[in-house]
Amino acid sequence: MPQVRNPILPGFNPDPSILRVGEDYYIATSTFEWYPGVQIHHSRDLANWELVARPLNRKSQLDMRGNPDSCGIWAPCLSHDGERFWLVYTDVKRKDGSFKDTPNYIVTAEKIEGPWSDPIYINSSGFDPSLFHDDDGRKWFVNMLWDHRRRPQLFEGIVLQEFDPKAGKLVGPRKNIFTGTDLALVEGPHLYKRNGWYYLLTAEGGTGYEHACTFARSRNIWGPYEVHPQKYILTSKDHPHAALQRAGHGDIVDTPDGRTYLVHLTGRPTTQFRRCVLGRETAIQEAYWGDDDWLYVKNGPVPSLWVDLPAARDDTKYWEEKRYTFESGLHKDFQWLRTPETDRIFRTREDGKLTLIGRESIGSWFEQALVARRQTHFSCDAETVIDFSPEDQRQFAGLTAYYCRYNFFYLAVSAHSDGQRELFIMASEASWPLGELRYPVPEGVRIPNEGKVRLALTIRGRELQFYYALEGEELKKIGPVLDASIVSDECGGHQKHGSFTGAFVGVAASDLNGTAAEATFDYFIYRPVQHPSDRYEI
């Protein structure tokens, strides 16, 4: 079989849940504060994937205004019971401190493209929910159980309860069926059944560099569950030089010809600081069932960079330059932050342009006008042309490399207090918890009050450089070289386990006067670049 290099979903695509229906494979991944919620990719061969749905796309399903960074949609589980698709997920409202507010929901659809139902509320006892359809027709709901008292630990275990689809609620007894191993932080549960065994796959160790997939089984769904003889069937925690780090939070799928694969999240750190700019990505491993009825990862437990898959991957689209215009609406590569009310933050135009409506400051947890796409390459270029006439320094719009409020670079068109237009750079560099900005060009660069401005950035590994050009002129540098590796999980806030998204590049607009000043963008270009600084393997 052809060998394919991991990851199969590059860029911010964590917590994969995989499903096969007939000849079709689907992977659902977390989207956190980015709207619409949940990404679902489709493949016929496990190698070539296409984004086909974002199910949580209207106000009656999802409104994340006020959700802090790295809250929102955590760890969706996608399943099919022979009649319809089921999607369970958490909409996290708070993650800091001892408490976590974690309402869990279910939506359903007959077709993967939708329409998806309005959500049914299930519980709030923890996160990472999963739905298991047993062969007797019963449905079982599992999630990790959170204990704010730490008696003995925050991650208390995996709780099981039956779900009644007719009543739309959990019924019957509830039990903590698995408390994990000494690695702790047990989460991400998925149940399976094979040869009379119930199998429980979980994640442990947190989503950083101690991450692992733990496997256990029982003859009874209620337990007790015995742990796999290897304990962790997938992990890179003891191999710091493996190309794929942070391996964990997996799910299992069988092919029609009987092969077994495990998908999992991974991170590819760059620089000596081990920073995952592209966030947590989705990788795949070949697995097999042993004579002892245990699952093993081929060449495991360390994840393989290259994996045998049923087909070769066509990387043509991955490396092609994307020039986006907006006459047909927002391209599916783009998302925005938190709000279902898009008419308040942007509109697409028949002439192909995109207009952003200035709202709150960049980094706001409520209503900011920011439209961006994932950075899916270690090195890339981004470019746009902006038409914007700000009145003062409280109105600004432009081009950004963005992770969260504590973690972004922003080249913006604004105005001095006397109304003269200027360009300036805002840098929020690992600024948690205060969120203070630095201005690499303290006095700004004054520009004419009339005319469009071309804005661009280049990223070459850890080096980010902004550029600008007035109409009829060539691009010129503005500001110093900035540290692009800052726009990463490791610098997004809580540096070990608390930042969960990935780097985006896009456009933004703010009007702190509250007058909804508009900025128009002619196009957006994303250009992948192959550069010697890119480290795909060590």
UniProtKB/Swiss-Prot annotation:
It is an enzyme of class 3 (hydrolase). InterPro entries: ConA-like_dom_sf, GH43_C2, Glyco_hydro_43, Glyco_hydro_beta-prop_sf, Glycosyl_Hydrlase_43. Its EC number is 3.2.1.37, 3.2.1.55. One of its GO terms (molecular function) is xylan 1,4-beta-xylosidase activity. Combining xylanase Xyn11A and xylosidases Xyl43A and/or Xyl43B leads to the release of reducing sugars as high as 1.29 folds of the sum of that released by each enzyme, which contributes to the formulation of optimised enzyme mixtures for the efficient hydrolysis of plant biomass. Keywords: Glycosidase, Hydrolase. Activity is inhibited by Ag(+), Li(+), Cu(2+), Cr(3+), Co(3+), Ni(2+), Mg(2+), Zn(2+), EDTA, SDS and beta-mercaptoethanol; but not by Mn(2+), Pb(2+), Ca(2+) and Fe(3+). It catalyses: Hydrolysis of (1->4)-beta-D-xylans, to remove successive D-xylose residues from the non-reducing termini; Hydrolysis of terminal non-reducing alpha-L-arabinofuranoside residues in alpha-L-arabinosides. GO terms for biological process: carbohydrate metabolic process. Optimum temperature is 50 degrees Celsius. The active site is at residue 367. Optimum pH is 7.0. Pfam families: GH43_C2, Glyco_hydro_43. It comes from the Eukaryota. PANTHER family: BETA-XYLOSIDASE, BETA-XYLOSIDASE-RELATED. Bifunctional beta-xylosidase/alpha-L-arabinosidases with a low level of xylanase activity. Is most active on 4-nitrophenyl beta-D-xylopyranoside (pNPX) (defined as 100%), moderate on p-nitrophenyl-alpha-L-arabinofuranoside (pNPA) (56.6%), and weak on beechwood xylan (5.7%) and birchwood xylan (2.7%). Is able to attack xylooligosacchardies with degrees of polymerisation of 2-5, releasing the amounts of reducing sugars in the order of xylopentose > xylotetraose > xylotriose > xylobiose, i.e. the rate of xylose released from xylooligosacchardies increased with the chain length. Belongs to the glycosyl hydrolase 43 family. This is Xylosidase/arabinosidase 43B. It comes from Humicola insolens (Soft-rot fungus). The gene is Xyl43B.
